[in-house]
Amino acid sequence: MDQSLTNMKKLLFLIPVVLLAACSQPKVVRETVETDQITCEVTVYSPDIVRVVKYPLGGVGASQKKSYSVVLEPQKTKVKRTETAEALTLTTEKMAVSIDKATGQVTFCDAAGGKQLLQENGTSFEPRPADDPDAGRFKVSQAWTPEADEFLYGLGQRQDPDLSLRGKKVHLWNENMHIYIPFFCSEKGYGVYWDNPGMSDFEDVPGGKTVMTSEVGDCTDLYFLYDGGDMDALMASERKLGGKATMFPLWVHGYWQCRERYHSTEELCEALRTHREMGIPLDCIVQDWQYWGENENWNSMRFDNPLYERGDTMIANVHNNHAHLAISIWPDFGPLTPQFKELEAIGALLPFKTWSMTGGVKIYDPFNAQAREIYWKYLEGLVDQGVDALWSDSTEPDHFYPTKEDDDYRTADGTWRSVRNAFPLVTNMGIYENYRAKGYTKRAVQMTRSASFGIQRYATFSWSGDVQSRWEVLRAQIPSGLDYTICGIPYWNTDIGGFFNWFYEGGTDNDALKELQVRWMQWSVFVPVMRNHTSGPLTTEIYRFGKPGEWAFDEQLNAIKLRYKLMPYIYSLAGATVLEDGMIMRPLVMDFAKDRKALSLSDEYLFGPSILVHPVTEPVLTDGKAALTGKMEASFTTYLPAGATWYDFHTGEIVEGGYDYTRTYTISEIPVFVKAGAILPFGPDVQYTSEKPWDNLEIAVYPGADGHFTLYEDAGDGYEYEKGEYATIDLDWDEAQGCLTIGDRKGSFPGMLRERDFTVNVLGRTPMTVHYTGKRVQAKP
């Protein structure tokens, strides 16, 4: 009897242990909590990603909702389930998610320390009007309560001089120069993606709530991302959710010459020839609109304009001069094009006013799968003809004089107000998927004026639209790019010098415009894509601003040459972006989250892990209009984040972090600093990226701390990298030993250099050259 009781006690003791073990086995976990008004569904997608969907009782839940941006499916995950009378808590190895049973509000905490990350503070559902095309659906809203002094970033490209979102009110409705992505993240290392492609609003009330609202939805739908607080890990979570970035060809990272527009084959080829004759490095030249002829033939995707001789001569000339051709395409068509006729026949043209305003041009409906196939059928001809990159302009798209009737209009996927912000994702998806299905050997390259969360998976990057040539606009581009790329999309650029510049009397002879152009060019060395562009009739090839020997020409040329010198570093950043979900433009929160001053800065950032950039965004030589000031230099102050020692890139001076650093700069320099421990591979002097092999690279080491860098190489184009055909070499600096270790080469690819020399240049020491055969070697200069 006593033995039986003892055995029973043992069995009862084991039951909770067995139950705990069972519930902690990896599985897809989805829990539902109902209050007296709403249903709250929580789905664990992975240890670092949790989805929260809420809807009125009896409404539409997660299983019935379409997502354009999210590609991740729920993964089997170890989850601990804890339930009390007040709350249900799901805990992964990264986070704990607690649902209040009375209110349905969710609190997110760090799993390791239990620290609260973010708490919800109200969900609302306002029925759409009964006579509305979206009747039966809701205006949906979710509020949170971040800490009062917490920094928030993201929402895409806002054209705002402030990087932080605190105190901001933002209407999320894409338009030229504004790319709105409903994602925000915190200095704490968490991110929130609000999955609604329709008209939305973000509002952060100082000292109060942070609110996301969408005009149309069946439910609130958000993804909470958190991987222990590390910002690089958060970036990996974003790419896991929205898709991996693709590898762009090596040439994309060189210099692009673009203008609105080249008017003929002869004009474009002459510009390219002049670059080559003057020794101005260049990898891509761009043909803007109207190569198709008149507006009635808008975007025919053919060289119908007789001044282009069907395009074959131009394309051959570009390729024979070791350059690449990008060409403008649009999401709308003139009535004389075959695309217009086919799209009209299937009801896939949107009745909106768009650009061009004349000629009867109409936008196509990319939400219609058949329309996407028609679009590609005609675009394919340009690709087959040899065009290297597609410039997808106006992908918001342009929509002039919008009306309520326009917002009510039903696309193939729903009303315009409910889906419009997914337009750029869907149209670029159609191009990319068809491109890959055709089996082209060259990597896809798409530059698009608008974007959505996850668009990086379609070989796409954006630029900041038709910005004006003004100093305050240049200043706003810096946080615009940083808030955009922190949303998971690594590539971005601007029109160097600005697009609209008609207000500068004398054009490129105006010293004020020259100074702005030079400073914009110097900054763009440290932007993922370096592309010069302007509006007509002005032409801004760098030789338009002066002759060799004159400052406006020389400083632009020096900037372009520096870009090419940095190419091994830049292409290695590209490799890390794909292989490790890295970032090229890094807001200071990525590396200095504990430095409160660094978190508040909007005009400094890291280019890769090692280079801090502080662009000059105010005039010195001129008054910003036309008059020369007589000043040839000026003092600028840069805050250098704490926790690192820094080198002035230009002088080699060593500066401790945590302080402001002030010095005088001429027109030849902008403030650029290198972190101690950095290892920078420098390439040869070239006219285009593939001109010379990287058979003798300089490895610059900035001592003062241990350092690491991975040199990445592949064939420069093609998709073999997806099959593992690439090589990496780890470079490690041991500060105590004063030794650089060049590790064993990992991987290979056709055409790879089997041997090379490295010139190791440790600052302050005599350089030394080592021969490398793919095996580990050390250098102690």
Give the location of each predicted region.
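C-terminal motif of bacterial Sec signal peptides marking the signal peptidase cleavage site
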Residues: 21-22
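Conserved, mostly hydrophobic/aromatic
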Residues: 42, 94, 183, 275, ...
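Short, well-ordered beta-strand segments enriched in hydrophobic/aromatic residues
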Residues: 42, 52-54, 90-94, 612-615, ...
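A low-complexity, Ser/Thr/Gly/Pro-enriched, surface-exposed linker/loop concept
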Residues: 43-90, 125-129
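Aromatic- and carboxylate-enriched substrate-binding clefts and catalytic-loop regions
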Residues: 67-69, 283-556, 591-593, 601
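Catalytic and substrate-binding clefts that recognize carbohydrates or anionic sugar/phosphate headgroups
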Residues: 83-249, 259-260, 265, 272-277, ...
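Catalytic domains of carbohydrate-active enzymes, especially glycoside hydrolases
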Residues: 270-290
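Catalytic core of carbohydrate-active enzymes
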Residues: 433-438, 443-444, 451-461, 484-494, ...
